[in-house]
């Protein structure tokens, strides 16, 4: 820019006032002298203006672009006239940031795509993110001469493949520098490219004042909706932008890779933006020009105008402006061009350009912006049947469909004691209700087997016992899981229904038999613990006691060789009466064995204590652990109610206690026996006078062992009958009592189970500590006593 000498306008000096009389002449001349203005260029030799020219990054045509946009009358000698410190600073700046070598352009016959493998962060919340990371990649800009199309941004041949972008940093200090480190060989080597500061200028001014038409910030080539306003947010100068340009390596071919990261240097420190440790990667894909369909239906003439070579006399700015003008025209759509082209079932590649699909690959291939037509997939009908088909029945014409077949769980036989749990009580005379009919399919086989066993007698009793052994084990597991959830009223009702059903069965059998000739010889041979044993936690009701008493008397009448005796005046004499008669079970050689009355255990383990050949649920599966037979014994006596005054009145008899002794095999010496006393409400009991017990052959099956008080498994090999206190039977009775007996404290009358011996020691220590420290808190008046008490209790319980 040529400078001209300043032209000073002529000054008209006003007429000096006439000096007053008596004033000196020198002061008058000083007041009239004109003022003189001195400029820096004339006085000091400094220029009035400085002009700097920046070379754009457009490659070989950068000089023409600069000349077309910012040429003046004397632009050629601008650098020559720039002398002094400013000229030296410009030379140092050019040396510090040398221009990158011009990249090798792609041949004019083809074009290329730039495929980034990362996603940019959204503009929303950018200021908050910059407060944490200090620097981030804001946008990737299309290369010069890019053509937007349906398959992405395509660059025609003859253009150098470069990557351009914007970096946003937090303005922490005035002195700052941004560099982009790029690598073409997987970080074997790298090069740092400086990023240039982008001033806050309106859109379209470009970078460095290149003027309108520079595609760096043009929304038509690379910046999506809202990206333009996000590029220059009104953040009050809190952030700054830097622009960079990265060339690909010389001779880059299809699949060339460019990795880069951003470094932000400030006096406070150095910060990096590396895509969360994964680096930023851009791939180069060589591809021909897009078709009108791929270019969103652009007319063929516009495509040819965009792809035709530019004349040499035409500058890049005019060429880019022409392309932008054609791209900004409204898109014309034709109906026949929007018709979707069907794909073949065997070939998934594009019908128009199969080579493009193969070169781009399935992952990095450019995806079209318009939606593809909805494809309808026909699924053959599948017939679902309840019965699973065989492998050979699957039709080969249809593809196999994987259906997961859920097999039904095996039906669990619900026991009569648990069929109506939680239901309202019903009258026995009204017959079976709906719940009994619903469960009939599960209970009918069991009832038929029971009736068949009653009719068959003792000859076919053993097979029926084996058929019923598997049911009680499953039933007890179900009952054990539900008894904790039931209340006392519900259990009373179920127990009453059990008694009524069992008593009605006994009455029906007695009525059908017509006497002792057809009555069953061994009632307990077909009865299981399902009918006779319940885990009863509460007291019995009056009706239940009466029903249990009647059932007991029924079994007492059926016994062979059993005679009820009258109780003596002496209650301590348990083994004899006034008539001197006792209940004597008949020998198995002479007739059927004696029938023992059923016991209903409360709060104890399920154990059947009978005499003679009786089926025991836990005995027939314990042969794997114990080889000796199982013998069960009872101790008690029938006594007469003094109020009745009749020796034969059996309704006044009540079961007092049943003592079950469990000992191990006879071959083991020094074994311990566990005794359980189960008291009831009355004091009368059964007293057998037999001197020997008959062993019971058990079946070879497995069964869960009975648990002792400490949780250990106790193998129930034999149960012995203890001593009889009567003097008449003392000499002839068989003493099966074990020599050693574990100490068992006397349990209170209300408790059904005795306390374990292992708990007496800790309980005694705990009571002693409580008695000794009851007055310590009052005496010490502090929290130390409580701590001592807690420690003592912990040592007592967990030692």
From Swiss-Prot:
Question: This protein's superkingdom?
Answer: Eukaryota
Chain intervals with Acidic residues compositional bias: 78-97, 569-579
Record region (Disordered): 1-30, 53-108, 201-235, 332-353, 417-439, 566-600, 663-688, 722-743
Q: Which GO terms describe its molecular function?
A: glycogen binding; protein phosphatase binding
Keyword Repressor present in the record's keywords: the answer is no
Which keywords does this chain's UniProt record carry? Membrane, Phosphoprotein, Transmembrane, Transmembrane helix
Residues assigned to the Extracellular compartment are 794-799
**Every CBM21 domain range:** 127-283
Q: Where in the cell is it found?
A: Membrane
Annotated Pfam families: CBM_21 (PF03370)
GO CC terms of this entry: membrane
Motif, PP1-binding motif: chain positions? 36-39
User: Which PANTHER family does the record cross-reference, listed alphabetically?
Assistant: PROTEIN PHOSPHATASE 1 REGULATORY SUBUNIT, PROTEIN PHOSPHATASE 1 REGULATORY SUBUNIT 3F
Task: Write the protein's name.
Answer: Protein phosphatase 1 regulatory subunit 3F
Q: Which organism is it from?
A: Mus musculus
Q: Which gene encodes it?
A: Ppp1r3f
